[in-house]
């Protein structure tokens, strides 16, 4: 049996993720009304114009009065903002209101929830939709963003199973493929396959931009640099918070990556083309196995 649709959804953070969640539920006819909460009036006004939300509040406009009869509160903000938001909502939530988030790290978010949510904690279902874009804001929201994408739930031992099932159903109605993981396993996996690639893209663009002749590099750069560094246009505040929150695991992955670079450097220094070619072949085969039916464009440049 399907879970009841949220009668009222309160979304804190009406950007790409929060806005797309609201649009997807609206598109599926699975939500009554949507209240949007944000830091800036301009983005909220755009969300209203695009019919992503039905009512809007900035964070200093008494939005917590909307929480008492909300079915679901989704926190779709940078993870560094979660502790203050948990503290702000806890006293105002209704007895049946479910709380969830869309943060890219989970252990830090859960730790903050444990210290602030009190009796609400069993109705908190941590979540991470693994979908996104380098674009941000309400204008980037899309009802189709989560279709066919992984959504990871990391419930606590004390999380109400009924709340987990309802959140699972709502993400499924958005088109997501829902998986359950521990918070620890989630953060370890996402460090390697998401957080590290973002960090590398930021680092490479930052290093090239700092060169005195950077304009010459941009002039001859092609699809290789463009595709590798697309992530460098991602929201800087959000990714700062993610990297800081998952710093221990991310540093371990950076160390492993440095070791791989050192091995490659040794191959170059010793003119060991056979070893380098073998590494490239293994990497290409691994990517092809991960993404069958796709062919990369790395040879275009």
Please provide the spans of the model-predicted regions.
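NAD(P)+-binding Rossmann beta1-loop-alpha1 motif at the extreme N-terminus of oxidoreductases
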Residues: 1-67
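Residues at the starts of beta-strands that form the adenosine-phosphate
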Residues: 8, 33-34, 123, 150, ...
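Long, positively charged, glycine-interspersed low-complexity recognition regions
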Residues: 288-301
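Rossmann-like NAD(P)(H) cofactor-binding subdomain of soluble oxidoreductases
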Residues: 85-139
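Interdomain hinge/lid region at the active-site interface
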Residues: 214-283
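Glycine-rich, N-terminal phosphate-binding loop of Rossmann-like dinucleotide-binding domains
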Residues: 76-78, 103, 155
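Rossmann-like NAD(P)-binding element
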Residues: 61-93, 97-98
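Internal alpha-helical scaffold of NAD(P)-dependent oxidoreductase catalytic cores
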Residues: 143-230
């Amino acid at each position: 049996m399907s879970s009841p649709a949220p009668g009222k959804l309160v979304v804190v953070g009406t950007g790409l993720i929060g806005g797309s969640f609201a649009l997807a539920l609206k598109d599926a006819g699975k939500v009554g009304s949507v209240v949007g909460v944000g830091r800036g009036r301009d983005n909220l006004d755009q969300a209203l114009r695009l019919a992503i939300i039905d009512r809007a509040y900035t964070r200093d406009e008494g939005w917590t009065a909307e929480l008492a009869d909300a079915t679901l509160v989704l926190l779709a903000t940078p993870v560094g903002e979660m502790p203050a938001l948990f503290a702000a909502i806890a006293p105002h939530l209704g007895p049946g209101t479910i709380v969830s988030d869309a943060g890219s790290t989970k252990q830090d978010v859960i730790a903050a929830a444990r210290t602030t949510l009190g009796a609400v904690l069993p109705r908190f279902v941590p979540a991470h939709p693994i979908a996104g874009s380098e674009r941000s804001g309400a204008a980037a929201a899309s009802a189709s963003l989560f279709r066919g994408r992984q959504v990871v739930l990391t419930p606590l031992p004390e999380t109400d199973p009924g709340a987990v099932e309802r959140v699972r159903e709502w993400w499924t109605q958005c088109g997501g493929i829902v998986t359950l993981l521990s918070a620890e396993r989630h953060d370890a996996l996402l460090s390697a396959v998401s957080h590290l690639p973002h960090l590398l893209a930021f680092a490479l663009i930052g290093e090239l931009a700092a060169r005195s002749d950077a304009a010459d590099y941009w002039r001859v750069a092609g699809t290789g640099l463009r595709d590798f560094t697309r992530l460098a246009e991602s929201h800087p505040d959000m990714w700062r918070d993610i990297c800081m929150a998952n710093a221990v695991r991310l540093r371990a992955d950076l160390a492993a990556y440095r070791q791989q670079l050192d091995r490659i450097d040794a191959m170059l220094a010793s003119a060991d083309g056979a070893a380098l070619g073998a590494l490239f072949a293994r990497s290409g085969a691994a990517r092809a196995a991960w993404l069958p039916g796709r062919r990369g464009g790395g040879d275009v440049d």
